[in-house]
Swiss-Prot record:
Gene behind the chain: nmt
Protein name: Glycylpeptide N-tetradecanoyltransferase
Main EC class the enzyme belongs to: transferase
Subcellular location: Cytoplasm
PROSITE patterns: NMT_1
Organism: Dictyostelium discoideum (Social amoeba)
Binding site for tetradecanoyl-CoA: 34-35, 163-166, 174-176
Family: Belongs to the NMT family.
Keyword vocabulary terms for this entry: Acyltransferase, Cytoplasm, Transferase
Family matches, as InterPro entries: Acyl_CoA_acyltransferase, NMT, NMT_C, NMT_CS, NMT_N
Length: 413
């Protein structure tokens, strides 16, 4: 073990030395220096109309990859190769999103990453890594997937950008902007000029600022790991009683089947048309990819009208556990994240209540939800508590007036 730690320390020092010798480390950016060069609105811009910020053609796009220092190289990662999928997993597991107190770190499973990175029409060239030439160690990653996103009623071909991750020892070395520029270049070469992304930090300029809400399922565990606390004048026993979830669903919902997809797509399309920013699932294949129940990845239940055989209601949530850092008793927090929910024959409160029952049966610790869609209407009745984290939504090379969180109909993983 001591030898392993020594090797890791030496490798980390070596990474920093390699970057110190490179041009990328020559100047530390200040403020939003990088974003001020990009086609995004400035923080204090007052936006009245929607539309592209700059119009380019393929002739304007650099044909060769951006230059990296000699010690580093670009790579396209193939999620169908287990060893390359494991490299992405390891980089994210060791270096990706942690909470502000460094108590929890997202743990995206390899199966989840395959689902997130390989929808219909995905391109391997948009799964971009940076390796150390000598050791072949993956030290940076960014991904894009194709999407059609409707903004103010207008469908736009975009990419969803996700999983931007740089090795901890190379933070502040200006590698993230290079990754962003390179994925932008490759996307532009496909004649796509807009993107959607989210971040826990404020950059120029959020199109919406959304809040996370949390519903406790296993109260005792959540207190033991520091995720929540016992409220004043309550005991653990009274807290457990207060947050008890029913054992059985109120309504006859079952997992989505392939036969349900055409009518489920109609239901989903109609529901999403109400929102100012929302995806368009263009084919049945898209819908089946994103909503087919996959163990430890995504769960989708539907209610079907027995006479018409049409889907009338649906809930879905995805599985995103977190590693618990430095807790002697627990090492994983099993969290369900609300995805897309549509209620037409029952209240949205009853529908999500049944989702909570399902999550409880599946042994989740907590159910997380953004205040997008109409979600804020059920938070009080279902005993959700507001979290301390915000999630900012952004559009690249597209400006549109700032939206309320309830006007957003899009969930990015």
């Amino acid at each position: 073990m001591a030898d392993d730690k020594k090797k890791q320390l030496e490798e980390s020092k070596r990474l920093v030395e390699l970057f110190k010798a490179s041009s990328l480390a020559s100047k530390k950016p200040k403020g939003h220096e990088f974003w001020d060069t990009q086609p995004v609105p400035k923080i204090d811009d007052k936006i009245i109309e929607s539309g592209p910020i700059e119009n380019k053609t393929l002739d304007d796009v650099r044909k060769d990859p951006l230059t990296l220092p000699p010690a580093f190289e670009w790579i396209e990662l193939d999620c169908n190769k287990p060893e390359e999928l494991k490299e992405i997993y390891t980089l994210l597991y060791e270096n990706y999103v942690e909470d502000d107190d460094n108590m929890f770190r997202f743990d995206y499973s390899p199966e989840f990453l395959k689902w997130a990175l390989q929808p219909p029409g995905f391109l391997k060239e948009w799964h971009i890594g940076v390796r150390v030439v000598e050791s072949k160690k993956l030290v940076g990653f960014i991904s894009g997937i194709p999407a059609t996103i409707r903004v103010e009623g207008k469908p736009i071909t975009m990419v969803e950008i996700n999983f931007l991750c740089v090795h901890k020892k190379l933070r502040e070395k200006r590698l993230a902007p290079v990754l962003i520029k390179e994925v932008t270049r490759r996307v532009n070469l496909r004649n796509i000029w807009q993107a959607a992304y989210t971040a826990g930090v404020v950059l120029p300029k959020p199109v919406a600022i959304c809040k996370y809400w949390h519903r406790s399922i296993k109260q005792q565990k959540l207190v033991e790991v520091g995720f929540s606390a016992i409220p004043p004048k309550m005991t653990m026993a009274s807290m457990v009683k207060l947050y008890r979830i029913n054992d059985e669903m109120k309504h006859p919902l079952r997992p989505l089947t392939k036969e349900d997809v055409p009518s489920f797509k109609v239901l989903l399309d109609d529901y999403l048309s109400k929102y100012k920013i929302a995806p368009e699932f263009t084919t049945d294949e898209d819908v089946w990819h994103w909503f087919e129940t996959r163990k430890d990845v995504i769960t989708c239940y539907v209610k079907v009208d027995e006479s018409t055989k049409k889907v009338t209601d649906a809930f879905s949530f995805y599985n995103l556990p977190s590693t618990i850092i430095g807790n002697a008793k627990h090492n994983t927090l099993k969290a369900a994240f609300s995805f897309y929910n549509v209620a037409t024959t029952m209240s949205i409160t009853d529908l999500v209540g049944d989702a909570l029952v399902t999550a409880k049966k599946m042994d989740y610790d907590v159910f997380n939800c953004l205040d997008v869609f109409e979600n804020s209407t059920f938070f009080k009745d279902l005993k959700f508590a507001v979290g301390d984290g915000d999630l900012q939504y952004y559009l690249y090379n597209y400006s549109t007036p700032t939206k309320k969180s309830s006007e957003i109909g899009l969930v990015l993983l």
